[in-house]
Amino acid sequence: MEMTTTQRLILANQYKLMGLLDPANAKTYARSEAIVRGGFSLELKALDNEFNNLSVEECQTVLDTLEMYKALQVSYNNLTDKAEVTEHRLKFAGYCAVREKKYLNYLRFITGTEGKYQEFMHCEHGCDSQTPMWDKYTKMLDVWRNCPHGYHLSIQEIQKILNA
């Protein structure tokens, strides 16, 4: 993270103020303030990672994934014979908090702050899948997009999407 001296001073002061406003996290803010004031490049890079930017395409893929899971749920609920797919397989796992943190943060923003997709967001561990899921969801989306009726899926189409 490249910053001018003035920018570092402003950011350091912001961290100091946050520590005063949020005593429960004062140590974290004090550490960040020390890093910024000191200009410690290695630690600044780690701080910069807290501000991962998502491209429009990445945001859209997360939204499309949520929409796909909504379609899977709606389609499953409309089926008369549900024996071939368990409801557990239709649960959205989320994203890996370690390797896919930026996607998980966006997911939490969409579902928490924006309040969208609440009807089926019952993931365990705060939607931390504890394993990378991006590639799996991308493959599932490819299959879903090729289905002629995205929200009226047959049991075979549901299975094909889940098995992608």
From Swiss-Prot:
UniProt cross-references to InterPro entries, sorted A to Z: UPF0304_YfbU, YfbU_alpha-helical_sf, YfbU_helix-hairpin_sf
Signal peptide limits: none
Matching Pfam families: YfbU (PF03887)
Family membership noted in the UniProt record: Belongs to the UPF0304 family.
Matches recorded under NCBIfam families: PRK05445.1
HAMAP family in alphabetical order: UPF0304 (MF_00762)
Protein name per UniProt: UPF0304 protein Asuc_0543
Source species of the chain: Actinobacillus succinogenes (strain ATCC 55618 / DSM 22257 / CCUG 43843 / 130Z)
